[in-house]
Amino acid sequence: GLIAMMDPPREESRLAVEECRRAGIRPIMITGDHKITAAAIAKRIGILKEESEACEGAVIEDMSDEELQDFVEGISVYARVSPEHKIRIVRAWQEKGNIVAMTGDGVNDAPALKQANIGVAMGVTGSEVAKDAAAMVLTDDNFATIVKAVENGRNLYQHIKNAIQFLLSGNFGAILVVLCASVAGLPVPFAPVHLLFINLLTDSLPAIALGVEPHSKAVMEQRPRPMSESILTKPYLLSIATEGVSIGVMTMAAFLIGYTSQNAALASTMAFGTLCMSLWAMGRIGAAEASPNGKQ
């Protein structure tokens, strides 16, 4: 007689792989199984495409590190690999300037998990050696959980940037107003109680709100950031400066309009009110951009 057995991939695996590709993440299969088996599973979940190939570990055995770096670009499935092969594949992608996350569950995966930028071990079926070598342990052994972690991380990073931009823009605008008034020999636009109110309420609460905005799926349509990229990029700083100058100009204009009546208290009140309303409007714009239905 004939007995056939099948261990099919999880239904959510294909969706997770597709989401990885949209996010600029390339999934690669490295397995000890036969090449035909590995290729069949990889095609089923979308890892192996027409533009990529499958190979066995023996193919890279005699390759130099430089040759391997060129070779890995066209390979999406590696079969019959040894622990040494896994390390070399991970290192080849790292030397090409990529962040590499490696998943594994066995003792033979431990060296590659340690070599990868992010080692991910299986929490249910994984060995203790693999868990010790990994930086992260999956409690449900589900690849989709890794994709969800990437989405959460990108959203958290975007929320932090939104909060920083809000705080720096508002404070930059207030500093410009005080500086311009001092240079022009005008009275100080803000009373101490105004500054206290701005720092405790007008700045803090909207910044906190921006930091806890609902997550957006739009972040998974973006390409990964370069490793060397600072959080304070030139476009980001330009945006902060533009918003700060706009706030400063509007606040200073309100102060000068009030000061034409020779009433310093009125001028200060108008400047304070304009600054608060500007910060409120900027917070609402930031919240709209960070919302699930807005742009990131």
Language-model features: where?
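Signature of the cytosolic headpiece of P-type E1-E2 ATPases
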Residues: 1-32, 36, 63-66, 257-271
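PDZ/PDZ-like domain micro-motif
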Residues: 9, 112-113, 130
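Acidic, divalent-metal-coordinating active-site segment for phosphoryl/phosphodiester hydrolysis
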Residues: 14-16, 34-45, 84-89, 106-116
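Short polybasic/polar patches that bind polyanions
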Residues: 21, 43, 182
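Membrane-embedded transport module
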Residues: 49-101, 116, 121-294
